[in-house]
Amino acid sequence: MNAAAEAEFNILLATDSYKVTHYKQYPPNTSKVYSYFECREKKTENSKVRKVKYEETVFYGLQYILNKYLKGKVVTKEKIQEAKEVYREHFQDDVFNERGWNYILEKYDGHLPIEVKAVPEGSVIPRGNVLFTVENTDPECYWLTNWIETILVQSWYPITVATNSREQKKILAKYLLETSGNLDGLEYKLHDFGYRGVSSQETAGIGASAHLVNFKGTDTVAGIALIKKYYGTKDPVPGYSVPAAEHSTITAWGKDHEKDAFEHIVTQFSSVPVSVVSDSYDIYNACEKIWGEDLRHLIVSRSTEAPLIIRPDSGNPLDTVLKVLDILGKKFPVSENSKGYKLLPPYLRVIQGDGVDINTLQEIVEGMKQKKWSIENVSFGSGGALLQKLTRDLLNCSFKCSYVVTNGLGVNVFKDPVADPNKRSKKGRLSLHRTPAGTFVTLEEGKGDLEEYGHDLLHTVFKNGKVTKSYSFDEVRKNAQLNMEQDVAPH
């Protein structure tokens, strides 16, 4: 086998080991397995444990998985042989379903006889509703539905990043509106600093793209190519950045030359926004003496379009932001906006990019509001918390079988563990509907076929190896927009 073939993705090896044995475990004469994915509600969770509730989720990322891993001819003679050899050693037994995979190769030229129905990408759906369903389209391939659970459930990651990012957008929108009267610049208030903090290059692309569903600022370049390739945008790029300093470009000048470093950098980038990390030695001295006195003349002459953005990067995030604002407020002319909140001059802003997660973000904007500082003055950078400090458990992302056909008879199936009612699964064929009141409802046991519920919001996105429906990134963003009354209005 040549190196290229060896490196090629093999869906036969992209499943949990135990699934290799499941074709032997279903009831005899099973001809259909139908499963669904949801972000389960946690009805019995102690609300004190978690500050953020995450009552709704942003559905995003399935389109990437379908296009990258499942469409087209994904089964070949070589891949079957490779899997056969691996599993023979892995299980120390011949348990691999060689016959089943050969059937797919011969009858469908290696295309998967599967249908996936899903809500539109970017949809914001309350927890506990069906998000996508999966079923085999050939009765011989009943075992295939849950074989691909493993790769499909990895959509938990983009869903969770997009959801968490959107919840932070709600917080920022609420406080920006309260302290300024408008939402100008909202989509640049939370910048992705997470590239180095994620587990892999692929994670970076997926996670960054999920954040860009809600915002437009990113330093994780990998997200741009993924969006362009798998979604497409009307804009040349979906995310933007600005020139910025890191500690090395400051400390390389030496401890006694921080002022020279600052001066050089703001001069190099005089007509665009520039962010300068200012805590290499003493953030407060930097703000008061260097920016506030020594280089003040270079800052006040900058335009509204090219502000200096001072970046603290250590200490308690709330205390640091407030103290930096306080110092800058004494050194530069502060105005009061229409809402009565303090505003730095347009050529000067602050970005907090250290220790920012959804909880510290809430604390910082609340602290600023109490001290009468407008949120217009600041933006935030988040890295590990935005892209990596998340698990499948945060939104309880789960994939379960709800319907099977055995001996020609359809049976609604479910699990309902005695020790955890939260793990009860749905029964039968599922559909998602809008009620007349505008809320979402999942209908179980095929009841969505009854006309009074209106059309099903699940659309076929994949069938027999083909992606049948795609969404542009602009559509995804539109679907995920904040609802001004619901999400932003003061509660």
UniProtKB/Swiss-Prot annotation:
**Transmembrane feature ranges:** none
Q: Which residues carry this modification: Phosphoserine?
A: 472
Where does the record place it? Nucleus; Cytoplasm; Secreted
Q: Which residues bind beta-nicotinamide D-ribonucleotide per the record?
A: 219, 311-313, 353-354, 384, 392
Q: Which GO terms describe its biological process?
A: cellular response to amyloid-beta; cellular response to hypoxia; cellular response to ionizing radiation; circadian regulation of gene expression; circadian rhythm; female pregnancy; inflammatory response; microglial cell activation
N-acetylmethionine-modified residues are where?
1
Where on this chain does diphosphate bind?
Answer: 196, 247, 311
Tissue specificity, in the record's words, reads:
Expressed in various tissues. At the highest level in liver and at the second highest in heart. The amount is higher in heart than in lung.
Report which superkingdom the organism of origin falls in: Eukaryota
Q: What is its EC number?
A: 2.4.2.12
Positions carrying Phosphotyrosine are: 188
Keywords for this protein: Acetylation, Biological rhythms, Cytokine, Cytoplasm, Glycosyltransferase, Nucleus, Phosphoprotein, Pyridine nucleotide biosynthesis, Secreted, Transferase
Kindly tell me the pathway this chain contributes to.
Cofactor biosynthesis; NAD(+) biosynthesis; nicotinamide D-ribonucleotide from 5-phospho-alpha-D-ribose 1-diphosphate and nicotinamide: step 1/1
Major localization class? nucleus
What's the catalysed reaction? beta-nicotinamide D-ribonucleotide + diphosphate = 5-phospho-alpha-D-ribose 1-diphosphate + nicotinamide + H(+)
Q: How does it assemble?
A: Homodimer.
Which family does this protein fall into? Belongs to the NAPRTase family.
* NCBIfam families, per database record: PRK09198.1 (NF006629)
Quote the PANTHER family the UniProt record gives: NICOTINAMIDE PHOSPHORIBOSYLTRANSFERASE
The name this protein carries in UniProt is: Nicotinamide phosphoribosyltransferase
The organism encoding this protein is: Rattus norvegicus
